[in-house]
Amino acid sequence: MRFSGKQILVTGAASGLGLAIAQAAQTEGAAVTALDRVAAPFDNSRICDITDEDQVRSVLSGLDRLDAVVNSAGIARRAKLGDTELADFEAVMAVNLRGSFLVSKHALPLLRQRGGSILNLSSGVATTGLRNRAAYTASKGAILSLTRNMALDYASDRVRVNCLCPGFVNTPLLSSLPPERRARLTALHPLGRLGEPEDIAHMALFLMSDQASWITGQAIAVDGGFNIGHADDV
């Protein structure tokens, strides 16, 4: 198993992509530390508000080694910029950006001891935009820049930093869409289907593994070809 004996920390591990990545890592032999605001289904599950530095510091200080970090926790608010309340904008930035910053900052001393990997979750819409998601797309665009800068800063410490840019994945949010909207969205994907959480987890594990030892500072789209053009005729 690729991660036998490895210690991996995953944020947002109670649901969605974080849960899928944490489960896949555990299946491959990793000892997973799962962080979320609610309990996650793992032996070492810690309730932690990643926007609170004291809580993050407390969790990380209790670990004696770490091989990889997955910054998967994220939230969104539906609104155009002019309709976005400051509190909502700050809440999205706090979880999506500040949380990734704080977890990475306090994980780095452990990762630098023997080398390791940080994997951030951005989004396919970070570079294209998405109507009514001003705060979300801004936060995910910032994750792209943060990833590249971290990769430059810590390459000499043998800490690789990459990010995934998932497309439209079957999560509870998409599952709630009316069937006709799901059908229209699916038709925009050259590969003819929406993503599954496992699609993202497979790439996440590759990027954290020794097989990706010469990959850093990269943003990898996992989106069924959505970002290369739409499959329907015009």
Locate predicted features.
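Short C-terminal tail/terminal secondary-structure segment
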Residues: 128, 216-234
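Alpha-helical segment proximal to the catalytic Tyr-Lys
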Residues: 109, 152-156, 213
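Substrate-binding pocket helix/loop in short-chain dehydrogenase/reductase
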Residues: 80-81, 88-90, 174, 185
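Residue(s) in the substrate-gating loop at a strand-loop-helix junction
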Residues: 123
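Active-site helix of classical SDR
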Residues: 104, 139, 147
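C-terminal helical subdomain
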Residues: 163, 185-215, 222-224
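Active-site loop immediately N-terminal to the catalytic Tyr-X3-Lys motif
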Residues: 82, 128-134, 156-157, 192, ...
